[in-house]
Each structure stands twice: as C-alpha cells, then as structure tokens.
Amino acid sequence: MHKYTIVIEKAEGNYSAYCPDLPGCIATGPTVEGTIQRMKEAIEFHIQGLKKERLAIPEPSAKAVSIEVAA
C-alpha cells in the first residue's frame, strides 16, 4: 500500500485535485470529501494502468507543508 500526497484546489463551482507523484492523475468533485474519494479512485486506476503496461509505479515522494507569511 502506498500513501500519496494530493493537492486540492478550489475552482469555480467545484474542487480539483492532482497527485504530484503521478503526472496526469487528476480528479474533480463538488466537495472536498467528494474530490478526495474521486482522487483515490483515479490513483487506483492510474496504478492499474501502469501495472498493465508493465511500467514502474512511482514511490510517493512529494511532501506538502503550509507556511505562514505576513500579508
């Protein structure tokens, strides 16, 4: 089992997400929770495709941090 970092962004009317370790693996949803669920499904599908093509499955390496700056 792998634990991938995803980035979720607020869009106009919904949310979008991507996984930095899996280029092209994206999802959208009406809520944060819905987007997370769809992203999980997208990652699983993406990895299945890599396996089918006998390609290497990238190890999770992306890290996310929040920083505070003066505004």
Give a label for each model feature:
Residues 1-5, 37-71:
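Short, charged, surface-exposed hinge/linker loops at domain edges
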Residues 7-22:
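Short aromatic-glycine-(Arg/Gly/Cys) micro-motifs in beta-strand/loop hairpins
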Residues 16, 28, 51-53:
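Extended rod-forming repeat segments used as scaffolds/tethers
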Residues 21-24, 59-61:
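Hydrophobic residues in alpha-helical membrane-spanning segments
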Residues 23-32:
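A short, exposed loop/beta-hairpin motif centered on an aromatic-Gly-Thr core
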